Amino acid sequence: MKVKSLKRSSKKEIASLFDRWNKSLKSGDPDQVVKNYAKNSILLATLSNKPRLTVAEKKSYFKSFLINKPVGKINYRKIEVGYDTAFDAGIYTFTFARTGAVVKARYTFTYRFDGIKWFITSHHSSRMPEDK
């Protein structure tokens, strides 16, 4: 029986996963964004009251979200790494190129390594209450 070796990541590698996700937003293609999420992941999005569980639900959310051409920037973060898992939580700001709107939000990404690639297992984002 072969024993799976566990991957211990670095904070730098986990930080790069936000960059990968943000780059997929810039593509404007919901399919590219959704490829970052694990099959059984949950998206609790900033601009939606509905938990997004399926690929179709996530794709639907990002289809409307991407219309305004969002670009995210990390303002503050805390990253913790384990074996095959990690989380990145903090505050980010989205600037929407189409409208000029700026939205500051709290976020949490949890990740799992599947032996080949890191995937988002949960993503929570909520607008900062003081900025409403």
Please annotate each region the language model reported.
Residues 2-10:
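A detector for short, charged/polar N-terminal pre-domain segments
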Residues 104-132:
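Short beta-strand edge/turn micro-motifs at domain boundaries
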